[in-house]
Amino acid sequence: MGITISGFRRKCSAFFAGSVHNYSERSRNISMNNYSNKKFNNSKKSPRGTGHRPGYGAKPDRRPGGDRRPGGDMPAVAPENIVSGRNSVRELLKSGRSVDKIFVRTGDREGSITVIVAEAIRLGIPVIEVDGSKLDAMTCGAHHQGVAAMAAEKQYVDLETIVNIAHERGEKPLVVVCDGIEDPHNLGAVIRCAECAGAHGIVLPKRHAVGLTPVVTSASAGALEHMAVAKVQNIAAAVEKLKELGLWIFTAEAGGTPYYETDWNCGAAVVMGSEGQGVSRLVREKSDFIVSIPMYGKVNSLNVSTAASVILCHAARMQRT
């Protein structure tokens, strides 16, 4: 069958028009499919980076040991304005030091706690009941016996004040110098021994030693409230100053003269060294006497607080005779 030129042109136009239409439809469908696939794939993508990202407002995980709040995984620095333990709080209330609050463990209202609460109420001091866990955190692990107090920090004195306390009492000065004692239980026990022996003051270094923490106050059983305390920059310089004030320096060290063969009829400063290192070389060189406690058993050393009690009680008796 023949076809005219005009007919051929019409068929070609129709063919190309259909092809263009089909191509456009296919292109549109492919574009839509790609868009859908891209959108779908994006919904499965993880956030940028390989680690877990907390949501908005979430707190980041702390590194181990990074929590420094009371009760966290790292103990807080022990404050010096917290007094813990029944005897310590009772003596605190007698001492005249300003007390802000008394904290009592919930349910503990018997024995000496009752006396403490009654005295606090009489003095107008708020008494607050708290959980035992809060007391533990507040006292940084001290043996608080269900009670603690928030008080003004103990006021430190200078060396001259300690010596003047002895003169005002008409007594020969007896001062305890703690050269780097780091264990709070030991320091608390030394303070307790010193007060019982009638010592007039304690000298502590500002660095490389424990401060007057809740554990120290608890271990002192209230003796700290009746003891003058000087905190010095340098123990060796403090020893030199005490010598200028008329005191003789007695350092407790192994290998010295037995303490009972030494003349204590004078103003005396007794130096007790740290648990591990003992007395520093410079302090030893500045000492007038090196005294020791003879050992007759198989163990060749005493706890620093035990040694202090032996020497201080002997020194106090000899000063008074």
Language model features: what each stretch is:
Residues 131, 152, 179, 205-206, ...:
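Short beta->alpha connector loops at strand-helix junctions that form conserved
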Residues 250-303:
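Active-site/ligand-binding-proximal alpha/beta "capping" segment
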Residues 90, 95, 196, 214-223, ...:
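Structured adenosyl-cofactor binding patch, chiefly the S-adenosyl-L-methionine
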Residues 2-8:
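Extreme N-terminal basic, low-complexity initiation segments
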Residues 94-97, 167-257:
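RNA substrate-binding interface of SAM-dependent RNA methyltransferases
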Residues 8, 16, 20-165:
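N-terminal positively charged helical leader segments and presequences
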